[in-house]
Regions:
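Bacterial N-terminal signal peptides that target proteins for export
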Residues: 2-15
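C-terminal motif of bacterial Sec signal peptides marking the signal peptidase cleavage site
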Residues: 22-25
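Bacterial signal peptide processing site
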Residues: 27-30
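Short amphipathic, basic-aromatic surface patches that mediate peripheral association
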Residues: 39-51
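Short coil-to-beta strand junction motifs in C2/discoidin
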Residues: 52-61
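Exposed aromatic-hydrophobic patches
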Residues: 104-112
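A short, solvent-exposed beta-strand micro-motif common in secreted/extracellular proteins
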Residues: 116-126
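Glycine-rich, aromatic-bearing surface loops/beta-hairpins
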Residues: 134-176
Length: 176
């Protein structure tokens, strides 16, 4: 003959079942989440000034890249005229805008794709001689989400401050 379960034992089983069901509701399948980026752009007051002339607006192109190799190997005019043809499958997305001389605080933020590993930036100076007209910024690796949403973390984010100066593009550390 079986002994009846005592009340504390039943409550323990009920609590265990309730916890199991509650955690099951928080479960999701693990997946990769692309990194995010937040870029701030400034332009020097004398940016894009040709010899003896006034400063002029400068066009910037921001490229989301699978690889930086093709970008760094290409010449300026090829990238300017046919970025898609030159970069091929390495180019995932692009954006462009102008900065006026002395402009500060232009923001560009977004989420990369899972394949994106770099952001390439091109500055279209009137005179390229000796200027750093391109830079690349490595993106954080995509984040693997956790099995339980209770412990979910946000993907890493690239934060960068880029200045279009008289000698070319450069990144600055805002903590200085």
């Amino acid at each position: 003959m079986m002994k009846p379960l005592n009340a504390p034992h039943r409550w323990g089983q009920a609590l265990l079942l309730l916890c199991t069901l509650a955690l099951g509701g928080c479960m999701s399948s693990a997946k990769s989440v692309p990194s995010r980026y937040s870029l701030a752009f400034d332009a020097d007051r004398q940016v894009n000034a040709a010899a003896g002339q006034r400063p002029a607006p400068i066009k910037l192109r921001v490229l989301l890249l699978r690889s930086s190799a093709e970008f760094m190997d290409a010449d300026f005019f090829s990238l300017q005229n046919d970025a898609k043809g030159v970069l091929g499958n390495s180019l995932l997305d692009s954006d462009q805008f102008f900065l006026t001389p002395g402009q500060i605080g232009k923001k560009l933020a977004g989420q990369a794709t899972l394949d994106a590993r770099y952001i390439g930036i091109i500055a279209e100076y009137q005179n390229l001689d000796g200027k750093a007209w391109r830079i690349t910024l490595p993106l954080p690796e995509p984040t693997e989400t956790n099995f339980y949403k209770v412990w979910q973390f946000s993907p890493d984010e690239l934060e960068a401050h880029i200045v279009a100066g008289i000698n070319g593009l450069r990144t600055v550390n805002d903590e200085d």
